[in-house]
Amino acid sequence: FLIKNITRSILISYQHGGLYGQEKHFIPEKSERMISDHFISWGWKEKKAFPLPMKISKLPLKKNNNNKYCLFVTWSQTYAYFSYGNNPELTPELSMNPTLGLLRYVSKKIPTILRPQPIPGRDDHVWRDKEFYGKIKKIKIDNHEKNFEFMAAHAKFVIINHFNTTALETLSMNIPTLVFCDKNLINFNSKASKFLLKLIKAK
């Protein structure tokens, strides 16, 4: 249908992450925006963009509490993310091994709940993280019965191994957040860099 009616159709795509637009060379995002007639966004401005308001959490800003666990959120890139189709071993080497070391250290200091980040239709992220990080016997793996906001709001602090929408969400909820990732794996564009500098300087 789309092929037959492509000249008479309007294609609308939408932003599916708060940090969508931060990277200088992220081909999937650039492709979506290039082929779309309109782009629904809640942060980035351009000719094609329909601006939407930011999501507002219904949970109150986090106050000091006596919660005793660390919520450790993982997102491990697939080999396709690195564009090395013949080198899937780069995923644990570049992304997962450093996280494993930190997770092992933190779990010795405080009860730790591992929450692999589920992506609809991409279960490879969840099972791989469970298998890889499950080597650490001290951690508890979250079963996702509670949503992320609930788990984060009831944690003493949150650690995230990728700078993504999840990190922005915990920061907006006033939750102590550590972003643990190799900054060399993300090449930020000039617009995003300005906002990141503001975030770094914020107190």
Model-assigned labels for residue ranges:
Residues 52-132:
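Conserved catalytic-core segment of nucleotide-activated headgroup transferases in glycan assembly
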Residues 35, 43-51, 65, 74, ...:
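Catalytic binding pocket for nucleotide-activated donors in carbohydrate/polymer assembly enzymes
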Residues 8, 36-37, 110, 154-156:
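Short, well-ordered alpha-helix to beta-strand connector turns
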Residues 113-168, 172-173, 178, 182-184:
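Donor nucleotide-activated moiety binding/catalytic core segment of transferases
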Residues 1-56, 166-167:
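Active-site and donor-binding regions of nucleotide-sugar-utilizing enzymes
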Residues 30-45, 130-142, 196-203:
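Structural recognition of alpha->loop->beta junctions
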Residues 2-4, 29, 123-135, 189-196:
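Short, aromatic/basic amphipathic alpha-helical patches
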Residues 21-27, 48-51, 60-63, 82, ...:
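Short, charged, surface-exposed secondary-structure boundary motifs
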